[in-house]
Amino acid sequence: MPSNHNTSVPKFSSFNSVKAKKNPITKSNKKYRSSHDQVSSNHAKSSFPSHRSIQSNFAVDTKGEKQNLLYGINKRPVPKYHRSSSSVYGSAPLLRIVKESKEGITLNKKKSLEIKYDEERSFDEKENDESEFEDGQQGFIPLLVNRNSDPSEKSTFSLNILKAIKETDEEIKKNPGKARLWIKMCEYQERLLFDEFRRSNSDDIKGKLKIENNSRSVKLSILEKALKEVKGCDHEILVSYYLQLGSEEWSKEETNQKFEEVLIEHPGYLNLWMKYAEYFTGISEFTFNDCLNMFSKCFKFLKQKLSDRKSCKERESTDVTSNFEVEEAILHLLIRLCDFLKNCGYYELAWSIFQANMELCYFYPRYLEKKLDSTFFESFSKFWNSDTPKFSEENARGWCNVLDDESSQQNQNFSSEIGIFQTVKLWYLNESKFDTNPPPRSTMSCRKLSGIDDPFRYIVFNDIQDFIVCFESETIAFAFKYKFFAFCGVPLFPPGISTNSWFASYDKGIYNLLFGMASSESFINGQIAEKNSFQFPCSILPSYIDLFISLMSFKNLNFKLFDYNLAHHVKESMERAFHQLVFSADDEYLASVYLIYLKQMETKNLSEEKPQVNKIVKKILKKYDSSVSVWNTYAQLEHLSGAFTMAETIFKTIFQIHASQLRYIDNLNVYKNWAFRKLLINDTEGCLVIIKCLLFPGDKSLTSDNNRASEMLFGMLENCASKEELLYVCLIYTIWTHCTDMDSMDNCVYLCIQKFESYGWGASSEMECYFSYCSLIFYYQATTLQFYNLPKVRPFFEKGVTLFSANTAIWEVYIFFESKLRQENKPKIRAMKILKSASNAVVTACWYLFYVAVQQIEPTNSQYFLRTLDITLNNEKLKSVAKFWRIYLKILNLRLNGTEWVSAITTKALASCPCNKGVCMDVIDLLLKKEMESRAIICYIIMLEKGFRVHNEIRRDVLKFERGDELILSPN
């Protein structure tokens, strides 16, 4: 999501109070007003009136809507609660320059505010300089990362920037149609400007802001020239880059206009539709209705474009997109819309959109043509507005299996009455329940509503009409199915999905990783709660299901498939969805996931009908009787539950019955899984026998010596034709080495890593999978065999967490080993180094793993965790991640003494996450704990004006302020 830190785009203003006896504009503010005029030169007409008096207890937000007023005591009535609004409270037209400090969060790109806690931070930065393994040391594995160069080297390099600019300019003259050259020119110009500033005065905050503005203006000028020269696919790249930069420079109205102009001129630029949605939902001025209308407009255009193509209308000469690409764009927008609705509190609407589209994808009646025409709308609206159970609801059978005149009344178990409370505290206590336990869509017909019912619980066809799509591509429908489960809290995506650029950019990034984070409720009584179960966020790895079952074998690692703290009705709906989809469509991967889900539910005693579990498992195995992957999963789960004999029988049956169907890759995978299960029960002889069966299929006596087997495995390593084959062979070779002791494990692992790198697959997902399995083997050796050899395996773990910082398994085992030698700080130091040097999803992942490290080592100390969050929230690409802010606010709620920085922190949180109700709720919680009820009321009003979904209300006569606490939403 684009950053919204710039001065030209309004933010929520601070909650700074203005006392009745203090003039908000005094001589002490002259310096600030001077900066005000300089920074907002492009908005001269919108400057604040200088004659505002203390009797005018309201401020006009000239950068937001014209009628945007904050009402003071007895001056204006508090606005009556309404569901939509044309104005937004709290838009700050300017950003304040704050005093420089070495620690703390950065406010609006200016400088850091020091955050004071009741305990001093004990993080020892000097330990960063400690030497680790060096070249030449036995077992050293070089890290494939770029290290920051020495400052003197950077200065030397910067002297050549002008020369590089000249060379690039000459290349542009020869090849003006290459976008890469124009972007390179922008980068060189930016480096030149910042290098000159750094050498002149690196402490001048105003100068730095000026350089940033100048750099942006220069790059925009370059891109404007480039857009006239570049054509084709490169043109879309440049347009996207141009609009991204421009959104930091222009006003929100101008940016919105630019986006619309480009999209009208180039409707085939599907990536721009995504950028448009990201921009719109990331700006604090836009209300919920504004954003929903924007999504509706995008959907209408893309669906019309898809309909025109299906009608065989003549393509535009510049239209190079396919139907598949358009459907991809629609799917991407659909997921983003549902996330947006969920974040704003409209969980019922988001769930209903998923339900409706799942009915169209998998339960579309055969007698209807897949076309969104009048016949379709008449039939589906009748189905949706009836009392018939919909997808994932109890007794749901699918739209195609329901007769037109059929209706079945469902039980309504949830109250939908709107509560009205007399205090903010009571309102918060009741409203926060819906944050952690959102209610389902009401299954009772809207015609039965009473005057006190909450209308947003009842979703009629008109509410979802603009957001339903008939996907014709099986690949898109397949992907949408897993997006639904990710929305429910099971972030599993088949490896094949990750090969697509749309899904790779979305699921490998922040969106996928955030599913693994523990919730803010993990913090109890001022401490980080004891170790929780963690979801493993690397679901796109090859052989992921097998890896996850292996992780389940180690109870101390405590991984899980889904969040057990989900609302009860969500878990029930998810289980019904699993059942409907597994038996209505052929999906081996989903069937395997469903088996794991059932086993975990049974293990955790969460299934109310345990006898039904075995019955469902048998039905799955019967339907997928010819599926090697499903039976392979079932065999491992039986072995995991202690049924070793049954597991042996299933593995043998796979080779006997499916021998003719087994591909070479599948054969390797099954043998690998079988051998690894033997390893985990310390059956060394059985493990060797299984591997010999693979190597010598004709030798029934299995008397071949181990040396010959080792030579064959080494030969297989030299002749791998694919990454997947190399992965399985390396794992089998590693298991063999563990069981035979013919070579040291560290040498074996180092050899396999070298093989990956020699093939050019040094940072591939297959190599990550290999690192994960090896971590588990090392963990098994340490916990079961009591064999600790940390000095030799430390380089392996350090390389693993650096290359694959999102991998919780590698981090957990690494932390375990270091804690045994009382070197708990080493993982922290490593995490800090990665956090400061990496970017994008890697930083996010590192932060998450650092959180795991804190829980594992110091569950009673959150200081390291706070410091890591400070650094993370300073990252321009990550500071808008609501999950960070929610946990950050929760910790500050428990640890921050006084109210000195509360205003600045809450303002920054609201400005960074303008479309997230959860952040607003945590801000209100923090303000109430600090006894700042008047400011909590303002945040409540902001929620109403933004259009967030609230299930309860505060009495109108309560929404007024004491004379001593009159508040004005003004610039910081």
From Swiss-Prot:
GO CC list: nucleus; spliceosomal complex
Biased amino acid composition, Polar residues: 1-17, 37-59
UniProt name for this protein: Protein NRDE2 homolog
Composition bias type Basic residues, residue spans: 19-33
Localization annotation: Nucleus
Main location as per UniProt: nucleus
Record bears the keyword rRNA processing: no
Region of interest (Disordered), residue spans: 1-61
Similarity annotation: Belongs to the NRDE2 family.
Native source organism of the sequence: Schizosaccharomyces pombe (strain 972 / ATCC 24843) (Fission yeast)
Phosphoserine modification, residue list: 970
UniProt keyword list: Nucleus, Phosphoprotein, Repeat
